[in-house]
């Protein structure tokens, strides 16, 4: 169905208040967007971190009387009469279908392809992971996921056990299994990620070789030949004591979700227990890998 979009510009510390006002005026959803397209990384738990110059965007049903909405919002103390705004009619689209149409098979390394479950595989002889991301992060389109997939493709995983710490959609654990790993373990804090990983494992015929745990339930004695963690720099630093004990001696560690500018700080948290490789970069992101001493 078609929608009406109302966009306001404000400062970060006023954005949530204006978002509440849009909901009260009849918006069915509100989103926040940086006016200058700068990313915000690693909000603290429970924190909604916003930009200094923020667009507040409300989505309204096409039948909404926007003159009435504007009149109502003029009483808001941060706005007032004649406040600056932009109203736009959004065309009627099947947004889910549009997203699906833009998600294409992607190749990583020499052998590995990640293919949307609704598309044909381009090379039936390759190692193909059929993926439906669902609500969990991890499609291969993000540079950090790509860096991890390329790294896994370059390892000899035959007969190995792999831990995917922060498994999201399960893409890394499933790719490892399809690349020859005997067993994989996926860990995440989000139940939706566990479900998405389980569904994707079934789709790829590897369910019997994949264990999945919420982080609070993971066994204390887990270990693996290969450990990959594609999360964020802050958690990688904070969880270094936990992650560092997971690889066996001589095992491989791969870390991503890290901006290139954060690489040194993350590497420092692991350098005592690992012989680290040169950092690999893709766009503004990087991957840190090493061997357990």
Swiss-Prot record:
For this record, the Gene Ontology CC terms, alphabetical, are: cytosol
Q: Which SUPFAM superfamilies match?
A: S-adenosyl-L-methionine-dependent methyltransferases
Q: Which UniProt keywords apply?
A: Cytoplasm, Methyltransferase, S-adenosyl-L-methionine, Transferase
Q: Where does S-adenosyl-L-methionine bind?
A: 145, 166, 188, 230
Family, according to the entry, reads as follows: Belongs to the methyltransferase superfamily. PrmA family.
Its function, per the record, reads: Methylates ribosomal protein L11.
Kindly provide the name given to this protein in its UniProt entry: Ribosomal protein L11 methyltransferase
